[in-house]
UniProtKB/Swiss-Prot annotation:
This is F420-dependent methylenetetrahydromethanopterin dehydrogenase. Disulfide bonds: none annotated. Keywords: One-carbon metabolism, Oxidoreductase. Pfam families: MTD. Catalyzes the oxidation of methylene-H(4)MPT to methenyl-H(4)MPT(+). HAMAP family: MTD (MF_00058). It catalyses: 5,10-methylenetetrahydromethanopterin + oxidized coenzyme F420-(gamma-L-Glu)(n) + 2 H(+) = 5,10-methenyl-5,6,7,8-tetrahydromethanopterin + reduced coenzyme F420-(gamma-L-Glu)(n). Its EC number is 1.5.98.1. The gene is mtd. GO terms for biological process: methanogenesis, from carbon dioxide; one-carbon metabolic process. GO terms for molecular function: ferredoxin hydrogenase activity; methylenetetrahydromethanopterin dehydrogenase activity. The keyword RNA-binding does not apply. It comes from Methanosphaera stadtmanae (strain ATCC 43021 / DSM 3091 / JCM 11832 / MCB-3).
Length: 276
């Protein structure tokens, strides 16, 4: 069986950029087929009304819905629509999505909340396309190196495998913290693990600062330093994450979990260990 995965991206968080790619990093898995539909940067009602019906044309076996703040008005409306499709659906969101956990459970939806996938400093005077790209590259460094992406793909792989084998599946109810992220990263060096925990924890704090700057402060002289400081924090988190991986590389203990063609995992802990 080939499991058909429909991914609906509404708006953008850091995880959105690579959510489809982390399931099939070399584009050679034979057990899945993926289609991604995106609303682009916007996440209003018009975008929802246009995007959601298109996923039905693909007839997926499982749906992944990813957006900022799944509890916000438009994503909440989309969740309500998806919950009625009788298709296993997993919602992926950032930290504010924790407030929607209760309603997602009631709707029978799975969820993965990535607390370190923090809101960007979206003030026009500060955020241009270059700054946006730099911020997202820092976020991706944190999410990839601290173990977030590995934890996500392992979680989704289990659902895919259960559907493929026609087993009784359970949808994930996962809030990603520094601790369970670095456990998935499987650091061998304690200093590398400590740096990764620090990176994730700093990244989590970025969102509250940007929320204050973007929604709770009107004074230019207050909110510009706040968004700039928040981006500096994410940059610092990225550097710590990079340093954590460099420590593991220097000890030849970087853990790799590559997908085989059949979707199973090829596990290696030394650069020369990854042999089929």
């Amino acid at each position: 069986m080939v499991v058909k995965i429909g991914i609906v991206k509404v708006g953008n968080i850091g995880t959105s950029v690579l959510i489809d790619m982390i399931l099939d990093e070399r584009a050679d898995r034979e057990d899945i087929d993926v289609r991604t539909i995106s609303s682009g940067a916007k996440m209003g009602k018009n975008q929802m009304d246009d995007v959601l019906p298109k996923i039905d044309e693909y007839n997926p076996d499982v749906i992944i819905f990813i957006s900022p703040d799944p509890g916000a008005k438009s994503p909440s409306s989309a969740r309500e629509t998806l919950s009625k499709k009788n298709i296993p659906t997993i919602v992926i969101g950032d930290g504010p999505g924790e407030r929607a956990i209760g309603s997602m459970k009631e709707q029978g939806l799975g969820y993965i909340i990535v607390k370190a996938d923090s809101m960007i400093g979206a003030r026009r005077e500060f955020l241009d396309a270059t700054e946006m790209a730099v911020f997202n590259s820092d976020v991706l460094m944190v999410l990839s190196t601290t173990g977030v992406f590995r934890l996500i793909h392992k979680t989704l792989d289990k659902v895919i495998r259960d559907i493929d084998e026609d087993k009784l599946y359970s949808l994930p109810e996962l809030v990603i913290t520094a601790e369970n992220a670095v456990d998935a990263a499987d650091f061998k060096n304690p200093y590398a693990k400590s740096k990764a925990i620090a990176a994730y924890s700093i990244a989590c704090q970025v969102s509250s600062m940007n929320v204050r700057a973007c929604f709770k402060t009107k004074d230019y002289h207050v909110y510009i330093p706040l968004v700039s400081a928040a981006h500096e924090m994410m940059s610092a988190a990225s550097k710590l994450a990079y340093e954590a991986r460099e420590i593991e590389k220097s000890n030849d203990t970087v853990v790799r979990t590559a997908h085989r063609r059949n979707g199973s995992i090829l596990y290696g802990t030394s650069l020369n260990d990854n042999k089929e």
